[in-house]
């Protein structure tokens, strides 16, 4: 049996969600999906469970007067990949702690630009708090993609879309379907369900693109702050925890899973080493951007996550306990 599924059987549900082409955002998790471990609403967002155990209705929250709710913006960690059920995502845990609605605006594999656009497209009321729980994907996607734009960033599936448009195979009849097939293949390789003969290759050195990554981050946070100020909402940035960035004693489960994933797809190990090399500069630069923009910055790569407890199902995504600790960290930092 797949060791990942043996130790974390809920991952099967996440791998089955799928994705669809979405205007402006390129792609998004499929809507109206219902599995034992994860469900999505009509917008493709994961359902948040309130403190009474009920699903929070996004439309109802947006239609009510006042701003007594929060939004968590990010990618797969906010989505809650790895959690055993909807109750254990960060937004659900915050809803339990605060007894107020926290909406899950996490979409898997998004960069900071997509996160900002995602909020712009779906925000229809004034939240009290906007939390950005992010940081890993801008760096990761720059490593995986052929190039990084100081305007458009690097996005998941970019190389496949670029190849499709530039290919002789491109035509009005097949371009979109072919692109989606390639993006799906890339996603399956990412989660380890299929292999790529080039997996062990180091895609590129991002030194030349590093400033572009930071430019996109600063632009996106600037835009998010403008949105927050316009709605009289607080905005806070939390650097998400990454096993590679922590001085963590790995649990036996983490050791098994990381070794299994590295053997299954050698590029995981290469990526982990790459992210580790940029750790100190990246933390400092993102914090400096937040200080420049007047956005509170917190880093979860701290002693909170350095115990030998099982906190990660892979180097990015967490267990129920990992997400609970993240929610408590956020609640404590914001004095919720």
How would you name each of these model-derived features?
Residues 104-108, 239, 299-301:
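Residue-level recognition of beta-strand->loop/alpha-helix junctions
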Residues 217, 284-298, 311-336:
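Histidine-centered active-site loop/cap adjacent to the catalytic His
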Residues 100-101, 126-130, 231-235, 293-295:
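Loop/turn elements at helix/coil->beta-strand transitions in domains of secreted/extracellular proteins
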């Amino acid at each position: 049996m797949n060791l990942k599924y043996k130790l974390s059987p809920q991952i099967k549900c996440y791998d089955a969600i799928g994705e669809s082409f979405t205007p402006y955002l390129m792609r998004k998790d499929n809507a109206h999906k219902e599995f034992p471990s994860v469900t999505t609403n009509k917008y493709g967002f994961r359902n948040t469970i309130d403190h009474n155990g009920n699903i929070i209705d996004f439309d109802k929250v947006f239609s009510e007067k006042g701003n007594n709710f929060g939004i968590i913006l990010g990618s797969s960690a906010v989505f809650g990949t790895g959690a055993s059920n909807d109750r254990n995502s960060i937004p659900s845990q915050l809803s339990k702690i605060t007894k107020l609605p926290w909406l899950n605006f996490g979409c898997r594999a998004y960069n900071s630009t997509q996160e900002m656009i995602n909020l712009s497209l779906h925000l229809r009321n004034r939240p009290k708090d906007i939390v950005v729980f992010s940081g890993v994907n801008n760096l990761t996607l720059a490593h995986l993609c052929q190039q990084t734009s100081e305007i458009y960033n690097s996005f998941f599936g970019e190389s496949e879309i670029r190849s499709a448009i530039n290919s002789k195979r491109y035509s009005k009849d097949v371009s979109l379907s072919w692109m989606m097939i390639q993006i799906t293949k890339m996603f399956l390789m990412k989660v380890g369900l299929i292999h790529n003969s080039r997996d062990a290759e180091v895609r590129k050195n991002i030194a030349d693109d590093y400033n572009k990554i930071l430019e996109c981050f600063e632009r996106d946070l600037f835009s998010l702050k403008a949105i927050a100020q316009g709605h009289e909402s607080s905005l806070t940035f939390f650097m998400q925890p990454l096993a590679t960035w922590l001085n963590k004693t790995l649990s036996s489960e983490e050791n098994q899973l990381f070794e299994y994933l590295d053997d299954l797809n050698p590029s995981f190990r290469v990526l982990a080493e790459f992210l580790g090399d940029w750790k100190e500069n990246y933390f400092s630069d993102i914090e400096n951007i937040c200080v420049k923009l007047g956005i509170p910055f917190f880093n979860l790569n701290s002693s909170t996550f350095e115990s030998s407890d099982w906190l990660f199902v892979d180097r990015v995504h967490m267990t129920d306990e990992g997400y609970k600790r993240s929610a408590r960290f956020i609640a404590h930092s914001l004095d919720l």
